[in-house]
């Protein structure tokens, strides 16, 4: 539980957010597939990414942790050992889905399990296409929900149109495709984060990307490499919005990943009237990186849907906070995927912001918010066990009148362990 009072002064300073969760997951998993030592600098030491490390260690991969650096001693595409126990993915959907793709072709039995939240998340979206490739995966409720029981099998490539825009599904199929006996062609309905494609390209995989199509040919051994993980734009988003809504604020957020497939939050906030500038733009380990300068502004309402949704799907809860304090009516459509995240994020953010005085109405695939500056009041709100809901409500509390209490606040450790310390530093 955390008590948060209205911000009494502008947020000013030079900050760095925790490392990118998506890239950290992929870096450690792909490194396990490359023979030799890979080095991952600025690896995110959070509950979700450590679940991936734990699963890989149970599969025989040596991973040495040195401060924020990980040294991974990969054993090749076929170098894994049969686990002696169930592989615990914790709360991490990325761990479970990517590991399912990796394990589908391994010549042994493995079982993937998660916590109560993860075991309610849909898995048929990976089980069906992996099954077409030849995978043998069983799951609860007619193949819908974890635990997953995987009996390794010989896989064939496939040509597949993804029914949902999901980078986790795409990445699971790409991992399976590395061990298939023929080429795989994947087509996305909308562009999703492309960290897997960039990383596999850098590691020497035979992969070609053309718009929404990905073509991957098996047979090439991945090369061990060194990664430097940038700051997570999804974590930076909380401070982008905080600086935008607290009068007089100006923050410099250093070393943030600004991959175009993830940077929808910057574009949409700027369209709302935010003042976010990118400086010192560079490319590090194949990923675009920049320093962000964010200062206070009066925000205007906006409607979002379509192709931008996958590019800011994780940022929609904090975007709802910005919309609640913007002038006018905002609408989010096409975001039904939020209902099957760690919690039903549409219901969670709608219910909890309403407790703080927001005029918000749920839709099946989003919400409508009638925003008004200075409209929020303090209250007792719940994270629903979801890290992004907790951090979004914390930012809302800074702009609300009076004290707020956030229940189950330590859930931020899933993705951003330093969140509360950083927030306290900026507001003390």
Swiss-Prot record:
GO cellular component annotations of the record: cytoplasm
Positions annotated as active site in the UniProt record: 314
SUPFAM superfamilies recorded: EPT/RTPC-like
A molecular function (GO) term: 3-phosphoshikimate 1-carboxyvinyltransferase activity
EC number annotated for this UniProt entry: 2.5.1.19
CDD domains listed in its UniProt record: EPSP_synthase
Pfam family, any one: EPSP_synthase
Keyword entries, A-Z: Amino-acid biosynthesis, Aromatic amino acid biosynthesis, Cytoplasm, Transferase
Matches recorded under InterPro entries: Enolpyruvate_Tfrase_dom, Enolpyruvate_Tfrase_sf, EPSP_synthase, EPSP_synthase_CS, RNA3'P_cycl/enolpyr_Trfase_a/b
Residues binding phosphoenolpyruvate, per UniProt: 21, 93, 121, 168, 345, 388
Binding site for 3-phosphoshikimate: 21-22, 26, 166, 168, 314, 341
A biological process from GO: aromatic amino acid family biosynthetic process
Assembly description: Monomer.
PANTHER family noted in UniProt: AROM/DEHYDROQUINATE SYNTHASE, PENTAFUNCTIONAL AROM POLYPEPTIDE
Protein name: 3-phosphoshikimate 1-carboxyvinyltransferase
Organism (species): Syntrophomonas wolfei subsp. wolfei (strain DSM 2245B / Goettingen)
This protein's encoding gene: aroA
